């Protein structure tokens, strides 16, 4: 395959070395476990966390005479993913045997797709950033192909002092291998690409993207070169299982290769592993070429053939994807690109926001969801599906601010009460006396008391009007945050003689 370099070297992406600047070239192969209740060629369950060898059929164990039968749901999921990646869907694809030996690969080969994959070239638009001014830079990362293949089993080395055991629960589970083109030029771009791809898969419902459970893993190909020169020799970093580790692995491997080249050495094409504890990669084995696997069509499986009507029916059922939803949020709710990007990153977050924003000010809803709700979720380690503050409750809090029932400060306290204790926001406001003080007489009394207690500050404020804000803060503090801020501000300015 001829690799075409489509990007001009970007000075801000270059890595400074002892002998000049270097450019890192990154491509990825992502193994995404297909969301399906059964495996690719058997009816065994794909449940995560089952007892070892509980979900194994005779096909998965490669018992003599057992033949594979394709799971149509896995085919549909691959097509849906291809459509989500704006990729070419191949109406005819072929399953091949990829021959190699692993102790946890009972067949002695993996059923995969080589020359004729189910999905061809596609594209992912990736937003990198934000920059200091809040802007994003968009890059295009090409998708070379997507093919279906079986996962291998798992070797267990910690069960016995002298023996290793094999768990075949994962054997035969359907994977989509999504191969990107080498279009990324920094660790940040690679992390943004992987984040975007995972978001697309989750929106489509074709992979849960849970990297900590192994249902999405990345093989990262890294090489370095002088700007404008041909691609260098690449090394593959296998099975990186978090987006943060992907970034660390790329940075470590790029530094390693630059150091070797600057010392006059040469890069060996090899497969490496990333050690998160040490923050570095280490050699695993020499990198195989395609001919090492002796691919040939699987004689037990006929070619996979479907027509355009089959594809069109699946396309008609696709959900709104992140890019389309982001554009709609910006247009319909007047959100900034940053806020819209945060809200659409996860499908559940976007759905929550839409419920809160329905019939309300979109910007206010976005601020509460991003700053307060997501902040609380991050602080407590909860998922949005488990939030104690429902969209209806958050919407009610926003309504109470808008109609003047509570102040913005009290609203923050009310959110924490609902988060920690639950309950209806309206009832909590009534029972705890949290309503905003709008009585001008009561507010004026509080203003007079603060001014009387701080005569030195009064003279300073008259000379420097911005200090009026200090008086406003003291009045709000004295009233427990219940005073109407606009009324307080107006009275403070009036009493201090500030226009």
Curated annotation (Swiss-Prot):
Q: Which reaction does it catalyse?
A: L-glutamyl-tRNA(Gln) + L-glutamine + ATP + H2O = L-glutaminyl-tRNA(Gln) + L-glutamate + ADP + phosphate + H(+); L-aspartyl-tRNA(Asn) + L-glutamine + ATP + H2O = L-asparaginyl-tRNA(Asn) + L-glutamate + ADP + phosphate + 2 H(+)
Task: Spell out the subunit comment.
Answer: Heterotrimer of A, B and C subunits.
By its UniProt entry, which NCBIfam families does this protein fall under? gatB, PRK05477.1-2, PRK05477.1-4, PRK05477.1-5
Q: Which BP terms does GO give this entry?
A: glutaminyl-tRNAGln biosynthesis via transamidation; translation
SUPFAM superfamilies, per the entry: GatB/YqeY motif, Glutamine synthetase/guanido kinase
Q: Which InterPro entries match?
A: Asn/Gln-tRNA_amidoTrfase_suB/E, Asn/Gln-tRNA_Trfase_suB/E_cat, Asn/Gln_amidotransferase, Asn/Gln_tRNA_amidoTrase-B-like, GatB, GatB_C_1, GatB_Yqey_C_2, Gln-tRNA_amidoTrfase_suB_CS
Which protein are we looking at? Answer: Aspartyl/glutamyl-tRNA(Asn/Gln) amidotransferase subunit B
Report the domain of life of the source organism: Bacteria
Q: What is its EC number?
A: 6.3.5.-
Native source organism of the sequence: Chelativorans sp. (strain BNC1)
Q: Could you tell me one molecular function GO term of this UniProt entry?
A: glutaminyl-tRNA synthase (glutamine-hydrolyzing) activity
């Amino acid at each position: 395959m001829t690799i075409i370099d489509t990007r001009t070297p970007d000075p801000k992406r270059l890595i400074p070395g002892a002998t000049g600047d270097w450019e890192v070239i990154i491509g990825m192969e992502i193994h995404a476990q297909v969301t399906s209740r059964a495996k690719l060629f058997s009816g065994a369950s794909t449940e995560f966390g089952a007892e070892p060898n509980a979900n194994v059929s005779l096909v998965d164990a490669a018992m003599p005479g057992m033949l594979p039968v394709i799971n149509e749901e896995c085919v549909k999921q691959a097509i849906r993913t291809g459509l989500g990646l704006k990729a070419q869907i191949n109406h005819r694809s072929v399953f091949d045997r990829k021959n190699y030996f692993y102790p946890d690969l009972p067949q002695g080969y993996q059923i995969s797709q080589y020359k004729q994959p189910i999905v061809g070239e596609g594209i992912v638009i990736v937003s990198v950033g934000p920059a200091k001014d809040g802007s994003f830079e968009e890059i295009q990362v090409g998708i070379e192909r997507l093919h279906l293949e079986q996962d291998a089993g798992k070797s267990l080395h910690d069960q016995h002092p002298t023996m290793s055991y094999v768990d075949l629960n994962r054997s035969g589970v359907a994977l989509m291998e999504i191969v990107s083109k080498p279009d990324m030029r920094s660790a940040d771009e690679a992390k943004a690409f992987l984040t975007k791809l995972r978001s697309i898969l989750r929106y489509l419902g074709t992979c849960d993207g849970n990297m900590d459970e192994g249902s999405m893993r990345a093989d990262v190909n890294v090489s370095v070169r002088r700007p404008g020169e041909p691609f260098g020799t690449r090394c593959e970093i296998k099975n990186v299982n978090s987006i943060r580790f992907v970034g660390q692995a790329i940075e470590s491997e790029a530094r390693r290769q630059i150091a070797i080249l600057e010392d006059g050495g040469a890069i060996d094409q090899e497969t490496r592993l990333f050690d998160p504890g040490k923050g570095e990669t280490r050699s695993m084995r020499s990198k195989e070429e395609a001919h090492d696997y002796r691919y040939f069509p699987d004689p037990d499986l006929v070619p996979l053939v479907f027509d355009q009507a089959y594809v069109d029916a699946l396309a008609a059922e696709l959900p709104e994807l992140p890019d389309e939803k982001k554009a709609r949020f910006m247009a319909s709710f007047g959100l900034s690109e940053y806020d819209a990007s945060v809200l659409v990153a996860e499908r559940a977050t976007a759905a929550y926001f839409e419920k809160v924003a329905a019939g309300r000010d979109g910007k206010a809803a976005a601020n509460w969801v991003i700053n307060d709700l997501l902040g609380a979720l991050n602080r407590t380690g909860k998922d949005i599906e488990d939030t104690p503050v429902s969209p209806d409750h958050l919407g009610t809090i926003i309504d109470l601010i808008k109609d003047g029932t509570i102040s913005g400060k009290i609203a923050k306290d009310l959110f924490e009460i609902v988060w920690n204790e639950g309950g209806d926001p309206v009832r909590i406001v009534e029972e705890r006396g949290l309503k905003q003080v709008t009585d001008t007489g009561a507010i004026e009394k509080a203003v007079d008391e603060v001014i009387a207690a701080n005569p030195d500050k009064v003279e300073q404020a008259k000379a420097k009007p911005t200090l009026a804000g200090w008086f406003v803060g003291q009045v709000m503090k004295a009233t427990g945050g219940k005073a109407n801020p606009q009324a307080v501000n107006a009275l403070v300015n009036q009493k201090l003689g500030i226009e």
